[in-house]
């Protein structure tokens, strides 16, 4: 088992500092990211765009240095900017699924990096049932929606059927509960 984890070693480099990215801390992280990836991939058919899940480095300012991150989910439409295992264009959409070891960096350094790179839409998703949606407006991220899943249909504040759409791809939509399907199994 130690060998398998050693082989997985993935890293990010931000502001010249190298961070090890551990494998998903628990199954919930993988389920949430997998659910989103499946919905988005299905919606991108015949669009010319691609969705990547934790397997493509994003060089967020290649003209300045060699810093890069590995978003949990990223949509790219400019295939000319794909070079080996890296993308140095501007993604249309990025999702970071929070884990204890990355939550602070996802909310601070990565958010600023994505904002400066010009990523139009950024979602921060917690496997515990929340989704924060940021849109880039005049060069700054603005929180436009913040969902906390209330999945008990008997409760007055049930919102599992609330529909969320991607800004750049409004035909790609999902119910809030679909993002977290299987997490409590």
Place the predicted regions along the sequence by residue.
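Gly/Pro/Ser/Thr-rich low-complexity, intrinsically disordered segments predominantly at protein N-termini
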Residues: 1-185
């Amino acid at each position: 088992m130690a060998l398998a984890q050693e082989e997985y070693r993935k890293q990010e480099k931000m502001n010249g500092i190298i961070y090890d990215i551990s494998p998903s801390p628990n199954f919930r992280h993988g389920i949430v990211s997998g659910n989103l990836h499946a919905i988005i991939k299905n919606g991108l058919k015949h669009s010319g765009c691609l969705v990547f899940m934790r397997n493509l480095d994003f060089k967020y300012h290649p003209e300045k240095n060699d810093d890069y991150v590995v978003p949990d989910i990223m949509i790219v439409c400019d295939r000319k900017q794909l070079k080996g295992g890296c993308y140095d264009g501007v993604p249309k959409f990025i999702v970071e699924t929070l884990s204890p070891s990355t939550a602070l960096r996802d909310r601070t350094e990565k958010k600023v990096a994505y904002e400066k790179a010009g990523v139009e839409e950024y979602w921060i998703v917690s496997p515990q049932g929340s989704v924060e949606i940021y849109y880039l407006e005049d060069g700054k991220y603005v929180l436009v929606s913040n969902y906390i899943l209330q999945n008990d249909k008997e409760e007055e504040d049930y919102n599992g059927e609330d529909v969320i759409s991607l800004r750049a791809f409004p035909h790609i939509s999902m119910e809030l509960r679909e993002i977290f399907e299987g997490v409590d199994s």
